[in-house]
């Protein structure tokens, strides 16, 4: 797996806690983690025993005519454990010993006999390995505070640490989904626009490769545990600072960005105990033994494939939509206990028939908050009211969908970027309900050589969009409406740049600065670009900025770098990428 940044998300100013809290691992948190992870030890043991029995049966079946063909692909026996066989042999030998475990007279006279040490029973005393992944976490933190630990002689200054972690109301946060050296994590950056300063604040470890991010301010409901009941509605926080993460796993993790160094997310949407592939199940005829797993059965309550896209509803703040490789779109109510039991829980709605292939992207319509827009590898886009999905409309786009966005300036307009490098603009009111009918786009951009993998629409300037592609270019476009140009719509390229991030996988406009965007890609490098440093951009968008009541700040040092700001390591200079076109 190569190093890359797969997704970037902004956090607007004034949202983050000025002084983030430290993660505390106490008994209450351990209980919450165990419940949230749905650790079912007895079920896991039973599944392992069944897997061993099935594997042994497969081995016996192959000892006949084709016994020589029993080969494991990895070069070793993945199913019949040598230790189990040795254990059986040792049991047979132990039958010759006395029932009370005392060695025989012959063994007493044998100087090489080690039966007195009961080495055959040594493994029986080790039980902790079967108690699950969280069984020994508590023992890792013997002292509640490093000040109490006598082995830590260099004490931290709480005031210095508090100052280092402080986030000012004028700071933006950026959350970056990054994989480097086979390790996946979220990196949280602080961006001070007034000083053009970008630095890493903290990071969060992830269990699998991250695919998408979505910021939200709705605190997910805490889970109820045996010793702690679900709190009342008036006892819950009303606002927060959270990031939802979709990965190659079928679950959705929600993390608080106001907690430093957490070990476990605030909430998990899905069923890790049902969808996890940690328990191997042998498949096949018995002639060969391979490490395979059963196909995950589809469910209306949770995803069984990778989560590729997330969208938070800004009007109905407790609603989160997700799109998955399992070909479904699901809706989640964050105000409900995330624990899924036999009586219910999980996703409140699952749209299983909207697409016939992997659903790559999903987004709520901010103007009509019950309407969803989806795009798929079946080369179609669909838009429908979540209350009546059967009455939706759509279009065939001719290539796999990479990204899509509603136009925040037009309730029914949206953009779609495709694998063939095109970007299409549609008016949902003109689309047919039958996909066999023609559905022409309002206009088409030949945006990139290769996939147009990133797309965003500026929330501050009407008609300003940005695209990023496999050709390593980030391009800013100006769309002039018909009423603004004498009855004729026009689309023009304002500026383009290779920001040095490799193939571009994500590019997003700032929620606060009108012409600042962030980009990440195949080089695992985050870059910010203040497009306002470009003369052509200032000229193209100057009138629109003035009409929107926005203004570009006076440029200084950053203008010498073309407005590009990156994370500067010790002894390095900021890489401004290539020059503008």
Where are the regions a protein language model picked out?
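Terminal intrinsically disordered, low-complexity extensions flanking WD-repeat/beta-propeller proteins
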Residues: 1-173, 451, 480-581
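Acidic/hydrophobic-patterned starts of short beta strands in beta-sheet-rich repeat architectures
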Residues: 173-174, 227-230, 234-244, 319-321, ...
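Short glycine/acidic-enriched loop and turn motifs that connect beta-strands
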Residues: 181, 250-251, 260
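Per-blade loop-tip surfaces of WD-repeat and WD-like beta-propellers in eukaryotic adaptors/scaffolds
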Residues: 191-196, 254-299, 304, 314-451, ...
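Blade-loop segments of beta-propeller domains
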Residues: 200-243, 248-249, 266-297, 305
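Beta-strand-rich domains and repeat architectures in extracellular enzymes and scaffolds
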Residues: 141-187, 205-220, 230-231, 240-243
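Beta-propeller blade termini
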Residues: 160-164, 214-233, 363-364, 405-406, ...
